[in-house]
Amino acid sequence: MLYYLMLKRRKSAMQRYSDCPQILRDFLAYHESIKGQSPLTISEYHLDLRMFLRFMKLMRSDMPVNTPLEAIDIRDVDLNFIRGIETSDIFDFLSYLATDRVYEPSSPAPDHGISAKSRARKLSAIKSFYKYLTVRTKLLEENPVADLEYPKIRRSLP
């Protein structure tokens, strides 16, 4: 009975990520089961990496450039697609986050660009994903984010 409950819980947890490719679901399962990270951390990794892969797919396709990221299906992203991502592509994504990403879409006058702290968190998720693919699973030989620096975060006054 306990095994059944655990299997049911695992299945429902992975169904939450049914909008993602298998390789991303495997990464999230690794962080959940092996690394023991919190559900909130796993959820943030899911959102950050889903946005990253959607952006990459938009940049590499014939879709109109103004296609909303939320409308892009990434379930067909495979290892070859991920292998083709270069450091310059990641710079493009970080630039998009810094200048074009709407900070608060529901506000009457939305600001563009997210904070350095938010960009650093997204870069951390990408770095973790590529470390998993190169070091843990050895599915990739090269890590395009290995030497990327994090955005400078301003310290606030106390």
Features from the language model and the residues they span:
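N-terminal core-binding DNA-recognition domain of tyrosine recombinases/integrases
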Residues: 7-11, 25-40, 50-157
